[in-house]
A protein has these predicted regions:
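Glycine-rich phosphate-binding "P-loop"
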Residues: 135-150, 189-201
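Substrate-recognition element of Asp-dependent hydrolases with the DxDx(T/V) motif
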Residues: 39, 139, 157-185, 197-200
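Active-site phosphate-binding/coordination module
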Residues: 41, 49-51, 62-105, 214
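Extended, charge-rich helix/loop segments that form flexible
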Residues: 86-140
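Conserved Lys-Pro-Asp/Glu-containing loop-to-beta segment of HAD-superfamily phosphomonoesterases
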Residues: 206-232
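Active-site neighborhood of HAD-like aspartate-dependent phosphohydrolases
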Residues: 4-60, 76
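Short, acidic loop-to-helix structural element flanking the phosphoryl-transfer center
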Residues: 120-134, 141-172, 207
Length: 232
């Protein structure tokens, strides 16, 4: 399997400054629709949480929209949401068995590129403990592709990127799958305003910045724009 992160390592500066830009919630007002209409329903459906759907939705939205973990990788978010749901007295009172996924816990600890490609490879290689995680993740991707259309960028994004390009190399730094990023940026004709799109398959946001910008630009010339603590 080719390493998608090689594009980041090979990236060569063309300007004095570097600007990393998060996509969901920063360029596009897409966090709410993705998590409320795609992620949360698939969280309930594929982890058998129908009996506590109200509380499952609450914890999913808390983890991914309304707390310090906003914008985190979906696999970390899944573990955190299940942990919080397990602690909810409403779930305990209904004797609902909130699933645990030891294989997922082990995988997120050792895998640096938590994405579709590495998950597919794990399952294909015989990691049956991740099979249900793949079913859920694939369902989320299908829901996003089906539902999330016509979500424009925030006002003045194109103008801002155009101005930034005069002095800086601009790059998407995101934990969204690359396929979705490519589609959304192309749909809104913004893909020509950035040097590269880095998604979850290329590693964490910190790893993106280390490979693409660290030691290639002066530290004071590197800027990351985001909407969550994880973008810091």
């Amino acid at each position: 399997m080719d390493d998608p992160a090689e594009a980041l390592r090979a990236f060569a500066p063309s300007k004095e400054f570097f600007i990393g830009i998060d996509s969901d919630g920063c360029v596009f007002d897409s966090m709410e629709i993705k998590h409320k209409e795609c992620f949360a329903p698939m969280f309930i459906k594929h982890h058998s949480l129908q009996a506590v759907s109200k509380y499952a939705r609450e914890v999913w939205e808390f983890v991914n929209l309304y707390s310090k973990t906003r914008g985190c990788n979906r696999f970390h978010a899944l573990l955190r949401a299940l942990e919080l749901l397990r602690e909810r007295p409403e779930a305990q009172a209904r004797s609902v068995v909130v699933p645990s996924y030891p294989a997922l816990e082990e995988w997120v600890q050792r895998e640096s590129k938590l994405g579709n490609a590495t998950l597919d490879a794990e399952v294909a290689g015989g990691n049956v403990g991740l099979a249900q995680i793949k079913v859920w993740s694939d369902a989320v991707n299908a829901a996003v592709k089906d539902i999330v259309h016509g979500v424009p960028p925030f006002p003045l994004v194109a103008e801002t990127l155009t101005a930034a390009n005069a002095q800086a190399d601009c790059m998407v730094i995101s934990q969204t799958p690359i396929e979705a990023l490519d589609r959304e940026w192309a749909e809104n004709k913004l893909d020509g305003l950035i040097s590269l799109i880095a998604g979850q398959e290329m590693g964490t946001k910190t790893q993106h910045l280390e490979m693409a910008a660290r030691e290639k630009y002066a530290g004071e010339n590197i800027l990351m724009i985001g909407d969550a603590p994880g973008d810091h």
